[in-house]
Amino acid sequence: AMGGEILGIAGIAGSGQKELLESISGLQKLEAGSKITYIEPDGTECLLNGMDPLDIIRKGLLLSFVPEDRFGMGLVGGMNIIQNIMLRTYRRGKGPLTDRKFPRDLSQKIVDDLEVVTPDINRTPIRRLSGGNVQKVLVGREIAQNPAVLMTAYAVRGLDINTSYVIYNLLTEQKMKGVSVIYVGEDLDVLLELCDRILVL
C-alpha cells in the first residue's frame, strides 16, 4: 500500500486475507519464498520476514493492526476509553515519566471522533460497552499511535450501519493524513466505494 491510499484486500473465504495482515505485523510466520518489505519515507527498506512483533516495535516501524477478534486484544476492561487509548501512546514513549498532557489530549480528540454513544463516557469501563463501541475503541487505539501503516481485518463485521460508517470515516481521515491503510473486507460495494485499489487473493 502507498501512503495516502486505502488498499482493499478481497477474496473467497479461506484465501488468506487476514493471514496476510498477520504476516505483515509479525503475528504469523511466512512460508519460504514470501517477502514483505517496509519502505521508510527516506527510501530505506526493512525486510519484515520472520520478525517478531516486539522487534518491529523496537525498530520504530509504525505498523498498527486492528484484528478481527474484539475480545482480549489488549483492552483493559476496568479502564475507561481514554485510559485505554492512552496506554497505546505510552508505548511510543509518551508515558507518565515524560509528558502526561499530550497523550490525554490526543486520546480525548480520538474519543470525540469515535462517536461512542454511552452514558458518562469518561467513567464507563470498557467491559460495559457494546461490541460496536469496543470496535470503535480498537480502531481509535491504533490511530493513537500515529501509524504509517494501519491494517484492519474485518473491522465492521457484525456492526450496524451507523457504526460501520464511523469506522469508514476514521479510515478515510487517516488516508487523508498520508497513512497507508490496508482494509480487509467482505462487502464488495464497500470495497469499491472506500478503497483506491483492491487486491484480490
Show which residues each predicted segment covers.
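Glycine-rich phosphate-binding loops of nucleotide-dependent enzymes
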Residues: 1-201
